[in-house]
Every structure is written in structure tokens, then in C-alpha cells.
């Protein structure tokens, strides 16, 4: 085999790849079908590793408080089984500059976008019309 085939010259061992570490995402979405599709899409198209999920505001805030450094991307739906995504935004106010918070909602009106951005979101995308923009946001360096 040769270097182009992915082996170290003369050793027969696979060469180490120098891929950037996968972005670690935590998902706050109560609809299992949407959540599963989102996780699959983020993994396949954006190289994102999902580290967990919550279906409620309280569950999300608890996990975020217990794992403050275990994520780089937080994806939040606004309407949850209990509580709201706006409450989750408040719960992650003490995050590092490298951590990004994205609201992904079916209700991304101008007013909702303003409220989410004022509440701490870095970006807001509509689930039904802005998935390409969402994925592009997730893959570009910040």
C-alpha cells in the first residue's frame, strides 16, 4: 500500500488522520422522530457528535449545569414537553466563548428571533425552511 491509500510508508500500519475533533452537541428536542433525524443529519452531514439530549427545560438545564464543558454546540427547540427553550437559553448564560447556542424551531418569526437572540442564542433557524443554513452554521469555525 502507499501513502495515498492511508498507510505509513513502509510500515503497513494505517496513517494517523488529522481530522479536527468532532464538535460535541447537546440537543434539546422533545419530538423523538425529529430528534433522531436531527442527530443523524448532524452526524452524517456536519460531522457533529451528539453527547446527549433532553426533552424538557429542567432536564436540559440540569445536564448543562452538571456538564458545563462537555459541549460546544447546543441546539434548542422552543416548545418542549415541560418548560420552554427560552428557559434553556437562560440556563446556559455562563457558557464559554467557544460554545454556541442555536435555536431550531418551526416558529422562527421575526419576534421569536429577536427574543432568542436577546436571550443568548447565537443564531436562530427555522426547522422547515433553513436546515441548509443551520448545517452550514454548524460546520463553519467560530
What spans do the regions from the language model cover?
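Non-catalytic signal-transmission and effector/linker regions of two-component phosphorelay proteins
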Residues: 1-26, 32, 132-142
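Two-component/phosphorelay signaling modules centered on CheY-like receiver
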Residues: 32-52
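Acidic catalytic/metal-coordinating carboxylates
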Residues: 56, 84-87
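Alpha4 helix (beta4-alpha4-beta5 surface) of REC/receiver domains from two-component response regulators
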Residues: 87, 108-125, 129
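Active-site residues of response regulator receiver
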Residues: 77-79
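Short amphipathic alpha-helix used as the core "switch/output" element in two-component signaling
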Residues: 86-97
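Acidic, metal-coordinating helix/loop segments flanking the phosphotransfer/catalytic sites
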Residues: 53-73
Amino acid at each position: 500500500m502507499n501513502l495515498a491509500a492511508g498507510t505509513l510508508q513502509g510500515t503497513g500500519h494505517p496513517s494517523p488522520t488529522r481530522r479536527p475533533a468532532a464538535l460535541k452537541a447537546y440537543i434539546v428536542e422533545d419530538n423523538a422522530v425529529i430528534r433522531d433525524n436531527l442527530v443523524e443529519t448532524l452526524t452524517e452531514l456536519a460531522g457533529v457528535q451528539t453527547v446527549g439530549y433532553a426533552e424538557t427545560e429542567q432536564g436540559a438545564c440540569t445536564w448543562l449545569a452538571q456538564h458545563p464543558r462537555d459541549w460546544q454546540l447546543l441546539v434548542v427547540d422552543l416548545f418542549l414537553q415541560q418548560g420552554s427553550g427560552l428557559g434553556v437559553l437562560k440556563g446556559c448564560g455562563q457558557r464559554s466563548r467557544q460554545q454556541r447556542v442555536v435555536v431550531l424551531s418551526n416558529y422562527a418569526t421575526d419576534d421569536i428571533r429577536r427574543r432568542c437572540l436577546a436571550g443568548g442564542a447565537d443564531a436562530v433557524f427555522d426547522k422547515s425552511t433553513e436546515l441548509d443554513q443551520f448545517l452550514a452554521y454548524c460546520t463553519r469555525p467560530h
